[in-house]
Amino acid sequence: MPEEIATLAGGCFWCTEAAFKLLRGVLEVVPGYAGGHVPHPTYEEVCTGTTGHREAVQVRFDPGVLPYADLLRYFFAVHDPTSEDRQGPDVGPQYSPAIFYHSEEQKRVAEAVMRELAPLYPKPIATKLLPFTTFYPAEAYHRDYFARHPEAPYCRLVIAPKLEKARKAFKSLLRP
């Protein structure tokens, strides 16, 4: 089965990147900026909230090992899908959650997973389902941020607890 790409915005890309690196079947995770109207934005530009980009990750995965539907179920567990412009302590349109679909099949699967999970939340799902347009990889200093800075306050207080929750809830999807 050929590899696939998923582009997902779930708040801070340091968190999302670290979370997806735990999964078997994931071949690569690249943090960056999805959507938007400014070509090749910088982190500083995206942080102004005026470029239209979301912090996101591109996940290259083997759907024979990790089906897209399971990847999306995991995605919904590692971000707050009911919050429009906030994920934990991070506030602004650049943290707005979204699934950027790369094909009609990805769109169909995402719609089905969203319908399946909607009753589990006390509020409507705010995560947007959008066609993929652009993705710009983040600057090198953002890549593998959690792995390189596990003792940084944000990593200890925000990312580590999120990863622990994911490890407990999704043992069957994790790398050995």
From Swiss-Prot:
Its EC number is 1.8.4.11. It comes from the Bacteria. Signal peptide: none annotated. One of its GO terms (molecular function) is peptide-methionine (S)-S-oxide reductase activity. The active site is at residue 12. Gene3D superfamilies: Peptide methionine sulphoxide reductase MsrA. It catalyses: L-methionyl-[protein] + [thioredoxin]-disulfide + H2O = L-methionyl-(S)-S-oxide-[protein] + [thioredoxin]-dithiol; [thioredoxin]-disulfide + L-methionine + H2O = L-methionine (S)-S-oxide + [thioredoxin]-dithiol. It is an enzyme of class 1 (oxidoreductase). Keywords: Oxidoreductase, Plasmid. Disulfide bonds: none annotated. One of its GO terms (biological process) is protein modification process. InterPro entries: Met_Sox_Rdtase_MsrA_dom, Met_Sox_Rdtase_MsrA_sf. Has an important function as a repair enzyme for proteins that have been inactivated by oxidation. Catalyzes the reversible oxidation-reduction of methionine sulfoxide in proteins to methionine. Belongs to the MsrA Met sulfoxide reductase family. PANTHER family: PEPTIDE METHIONINE SULFOXIDE REDUCTASE, PEPTIDE METHIONINE SULFOXIDE REDUCTASE MSRA 2. This is Peptide methionine sulfoxide reductase MsrA. It comes from Thermus thermophilus (strain ATCC BAA-163 / DSM 7039 / HB27).
